């Protein structure tokens, strides 16, 4: 398995599970494989790999069926900044998505919740109120997840202005 990266390429380290080996023998694959689509899905048939020795001789084995791989959703991060305003609500408009694949873009909407309303750096944001939608550059929301990502907001101090008057003496 590997995380979504907008390509159909599967690298040898992405294939990690083998069944039917004898005793404690292990195998690996060599080369670079490919799948029919770059999008998130399970059990893609992979072409282009050959069996390679591990702690077992690959010449003692044949591939029975297909080599398969899963492409899992890419984990999105979010960063943003705004002035302290007495609220923990965080508008999508102050946040930017990070860890997008290639030149893909997504549309972010909704409202998140900051861990605090006061000034501070790297304030954690609960993203349950946000949603993503398909964007430009081939960005499909179904290829991404917020789960496991870092979602932070820098809250700057609000400017305070002091004015006064005094009587002429």
Over which residues does each language-model region extend?
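Short loop/turn motifs that initiate or flank beta-strands
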Residues: 1-168
């Amino acid at each position: 398995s590997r995380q979504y990266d907008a390509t159909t390429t599967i690298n040898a380290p992405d294939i990690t599970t083998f069944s039917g080996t004898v005793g404690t023998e292990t195998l690996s694959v060599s080369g670079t494989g490919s799948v029919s689509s770059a999008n998130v899905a399970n059990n893609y048939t992979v072409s282009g790999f050959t069996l390679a020795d591990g702690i077992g001789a690959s010449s003692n084995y044949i591939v029975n069926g297909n080599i398969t791989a899963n492409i899992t959703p890419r984990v999105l991060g979010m960063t943003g900044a705004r002035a302290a305003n007495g609220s923990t609500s965080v508008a999508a408009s102050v946040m930017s998505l990070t860890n997008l694949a290639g030149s893909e873009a997504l549309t972010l909407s909704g409202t998140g919740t900051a861990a605090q309303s006061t000034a501070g750096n790297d304030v954690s944001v609960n993203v349950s109120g946000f949603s993503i939608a398909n964007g430009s550059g081939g960005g499909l929301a179904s290829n991404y997840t917020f789960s496991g990502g870092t979602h932070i907001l820098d809250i700057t101090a609000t400017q305070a202005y002091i004015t006064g008057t005094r009587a002429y003496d």
